[in-house]
């Protein structure tokens, strides 16, 4: 019997609208980019599937201005100051066999810088991490979440985001 592995494939869909002088909105970017699922992301997904971790689902989508090439060993956006992570809302989680669609809406006043990089991560607290515990009124320990980036990609045609532009970033993930 041959051992067969099923790859996790993913794409990032970036769709941007720009306000026009007459009040209408025009699509100025509609790109689909193949992403790189990073090593820690693969580990987190497999641990979640195997119920080794109780949490581990994708919770945030982020954008940043770093031009550092995407690599499997990365664990976060590479931008040092211009970046923003947004929480994926329940209504923005859609599964249509065989693809999972996760999206966030970056409004006109959010993330107004050049978007060179896009990423998705789990930002929940792992069951093995420290939790907040009170004995009476004394704080005995403190939670320190350690986000796990699943995938990151650098856009070869970056968006220059301004207050006249609204963007939806959608991650599409599928096995096979």
Walk through the language-model features, giving the residues of each.
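Small cysteine-rich, disulfide-bonded extracellular modules of the LU/uPAR three-finger superfamily
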Residues: 1-115, 123-176
């Amino acid at each position: 019997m041959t051992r067969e592995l099923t790859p996790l494939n993913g794409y990032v869909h970036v769709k941007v609208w720009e306000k026009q002088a007459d009040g209408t909105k025009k699509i100025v970017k509609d790109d689909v980019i193949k992403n790189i699922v990073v090593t820690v992301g693969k580990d987190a997904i497999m641990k979640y599937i195997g119920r080794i971790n109780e949490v581990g689902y994708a919770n945030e989508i982020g954008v940043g201005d770093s031009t550092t090439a995407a690599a499997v060993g990365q664990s976060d956006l590479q931008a040092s100051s211009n970046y923003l992570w947004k929480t994926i809302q329940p209504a923005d989680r859609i599964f249509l066999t065989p693809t999972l669609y996760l999206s966030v809406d970056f409004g006109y006043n959010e993330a107004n810088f050049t978007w060179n990089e896009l990423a998705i991560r789990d930002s929940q607290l792992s069951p093995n991490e420290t939790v907040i515990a009170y004995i009476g009124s004394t704080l005995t320990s403190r939670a320190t979440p350690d986000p796990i980036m699943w995938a990151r990609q650098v856009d070869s045609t970056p968006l220059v985001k301004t207050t006249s532009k609204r963007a939806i970033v959608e991650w599409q993930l599928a096995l096979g």
